[in-house]
Amino acid sequence: TREVVLEVKKLNHSFGETIVAKDINFQCHQGEVIALIGPNGTGKSTIGRILAGLLKEKSGEVVLFGKHCRPKGRLGKVWYIPQDLDSQLFGEDLLDELTTGAEVSPERKQAAEEILEALELMPFIKQHPSTLSGGQKQRLALGVALMHEAPIIILDEPTSGLDGTNMRNVSKMIRKLAKMGRTIIVITHDAECALACCERAIRLENGCITDDFQIRGAE
């Protein structure tokens, strides 16, 4: 059996009178790819931001690797990739994007190049991130999460606006990261996206979990 890396217990959140997460309970295992699915406005992104420590829950508990974890402690361990990637990508080129924020040692440069190779982005290494396609930007954002060694990665609507080819490429990379032991949560309203890359789905409606089911066995 795979290790439980993330557990959510009785999580509640609201904005004013509007309840966006009500008594949310679920577990995620190492190497699992889970879809948080449901229509827009059902609290999916809010839950994602809470798990990543970007938003403090009103009540409830988030447990990482068996230990209760406050929002600050979740930063960096749970990596949130938003839908609007242009607000996240700042580097001069792809290598700079992956190595920014630290002095670039030869080892760090090699690690970044290996990640770009794995994500099939090496041909674009000298390009500015803004010149990439939507699918390539998603893969680059995954690369940034890998450079930070985040064990849990949350992608918010990763296939939004992508054509079939780019969607398949992003799905392939998500499954590849899961095989490397990363736990991936995919926030989506798109059943096709969930079917393409996830093994399990948690359905949300009006801030509540209405279903939690296997899509397929672990690969």
PLM segments and residue spans:
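Helix-to-loop junction immediately C-terminal to a conserved catalytic motif
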Residues: 52
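H-loop/switch region of ABC-family ATPase nucleotide-binding domains
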Residues: 188-189
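The feature captures the beta-strand-to-loop junction immediately N-terminal to the Walker
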Residues: 37-39
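Conserved ABC ATPase "signature" region
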Residues: 107-124
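Catalytic Walker B motif of ABC-type/P-loop ATPase nucleotide-binding domains
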Residues: 153-156
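Conserved ABC transporter NBD signature motif
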Residues: 60-74
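Conserved ABC ATPase signature
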Residues: 128-132
